[in-house]
């Protein structure tokens, strides 16, 4: 039997914010039910983990460890149903499941909750498919935890702390959930939801097949994420054009190719968004504590609105920036892109206080994700590159680029920073400091790369975008 090749697809997400009060009430009921069910599943997964972990300690004669306490009646009941479940699998000619090693999965829990008529799993507020999806999500989280835990004991140097067992959600709080396209549909420019006649207008133009709708609670509001499956766009032919990006505060993106094209994105609005939000947050905190100086700052509708407005504006900024990067790559036939990123780069930032605050509040991980998402649709390979010493080394002098460690701390380089924004090479040539960093990131990611060293206009007088919301306004210098 010949296996069919898996069809390659891409995904598009459209976000909507729910303003309708009736719909908010509808989603609140489901979010409460989702939270209760999530805690039920977490309880069962935690109990089974405690039981199997104790077995592991006993079988491997591991001493000086604290044994976990668990609900023995629940474990006995789970084991009884596991036996029946595996017997049913055998009758169907399927392999039995080793629950001790692999843990609980969504299929077994679906069978188990149906068998014992678990109240939260069979809650009529949630559709059966939504309950199944919540179960799958929690069990996957536990499997990922167990995998990382075993890896932690083998390679502790890779981790900053021991992976934590997934915790319970707060009682009487709300958790996210999602609908499949079987229960939540789009017809006649309206989104129809299960178990209600309420609808939500949907006037966006979209291509592809709607596959699911995620419902997320954010800042006391509900956000919908409609996911569409699309055929991939025509992939670009493999070229020898390589690009690299250096991310920063003043120049959000400094991108250059090995063929002598470059671009700076230096819109200051992102810093303004953060600065305005910080002032508003400080004002609200001050108003809360002015009468009681030692009292704790509490969440409020005012604070939620400030955070919400800031995050929406920043997310829009990041989408626009990712689109500019995509446009640059398509215009210059780029087939591979390296983005500089250091592990834990937001935890030990060697900047002055103002720049450090701006750096930490810029969601670079979100920007990297959006760039990857957009470029992958066109077959452009994107990789993250460790970037230690890329800002200190001289790209034009081909300085060696070690990975940071104690031995490399005293490494000397040919050039130096002349002043803010400029780098001076060994020959005294002044180039843009961020583009020098981008070239070094390229050299680290692709050691055999050859780049333009004769015509340095792309390093000295690059194209610049100063307003991302109007990316056609490109100036020189």
Label the predicted regions.
Residues 1-131:
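Gly/serine-rich nucleotide phosphate-binding loop at the start of the catalytic core
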Residues 7-18, 198-204, 263-268:
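Generic detection of short hydrophobic beta-strand segments and adjacent strand-loop junctions
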Residues 34, 82, 135-142, 303-306, ...:
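Short amphipathic alpha-helical coiled-coil/interface segments
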Residues 41, 133-145, 433-445:
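Stable alpha-helical structural segments in soluble proteins, enriched in small hydrophobic residues
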Residues 42-49, 142, 146-153, 230:
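Long, hydrophobic, amphipathic alpha-helical segments used as structural scaffolds
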Residues 72-218, 357, 361:
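Acidic carboxylate diad motif detector
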Residues 222-477:
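Positively charged, helix-rich recognition surfaces that bind polyanionic ligands
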